Amino acid sequence: MATPVYIVLPSRPDHVVSTAKDHAVQGYTELHPYDPSQTEGRLWIFDNDGYIRLAANHNLVLDVNGGAAKEGNTVLSYPDKKDHAKNQLWVNKDCILHTKLDESFHLGVNDKGQVIITQKKEQRVILRAPASLEKRPSAWERHEGELNVVAVGAGNHDVWGVNHLEHIYHWDGSKWHQIEGAATNISVGLDGTVWCVNKAHEIYRLDRGTNKWSIVPGELVQVSVGNSHNIWGVNHLDAIYKWNADSNSWTFVDGQLTNVSVGHDGTVYGVNRAGNIYHYNGNSWDAVSGELVQIHVANKDLIVGVNKAGHVYRLKHGKDWEKLEGELSWVAVGHGGELWGANSAHNIYKALL
């Protein structure tokens, strides 16, 4: 039997998927606060057959209420290796749990804290070993390769970067692939949208099917992609722009920044030449305490940055900066808390927030 794991919502890593206290069959599962002293009903086993079993009772498995081909709640039931097994079997892809019946659906959590089947990427949950919750963030590990800029998409299988020679690379979870083209800055969204800029300030977006770049009107020195509908950038004059997909043009945003970042949920932060930090409220910029030279936003709950000394920080509760270990010149965070960074020597590091 596999090692027990927690099932965690990345945007709320202090909560885990749990059952009702009596572990009742057909009882709904919910999101509960993480407490290392309370594990019964909160630890799960993903076995070799594809069942997600309750660690406290291996006879109970996570099931889909009414089928797996639509959104719906999850419940506990007894494993059925005949008629209903297709609703009880799961596929683990990069620690994300998809239904075997239809892998476009995955396990997630709705706004009420109920564990559901969904296609919404921002709601999906991931597997985490107990040790990874007890020590968060995890220690930085050296990763192969050299980069100046790094970006994280849907997880550790979709990481992009550029090096000091302006070469573009994509990490697919097992190795780096050099991508045709040259860039000085690159960004990838949760939905896999990739944009970059080169030293001539030209802007390009990638066709993921052909790995070919197409030019985008405008000039930028830095671009940030939350998803295909949330793209921001700054130019060499520190002017700020937001992409309008409907008109295929840029909309000027008042203010001056040297670095801007947008999450898949539309959350936007930026820093200026003085190192001041700002949060966009939809109409104007609100000052945020602290000083940074680079900032990265996955969503409103996952925001990291580095200052001019190379110190790494994460924003907690939208106002308090927590210093993390390590010294980097660039940092990025994925929707699942995947931390990637590069230092002044171009060395690459990764961790888990």
Curated annotation (Swiss-Prot):
All copies of the Ricin B-type lectin domain together span: 44-93
Which segments carry the sequence repeats? 138-173, 174-210, 211-247, 248-282, 283-318, 319-353
Q: Which Pfam families match?
A: Tectonin
Q: What is this protein called?
A: Tectonin-2
Q: Which residue intervals make up region (6 X approximate tandem repeats)?
A: 138-353
Recorded source organism is Physarum polycephalum (Slime mold)
What are the annotated GO cellular component locations?
cell surface; cytoplasmic vesicle membrane
Give the main localization category: other
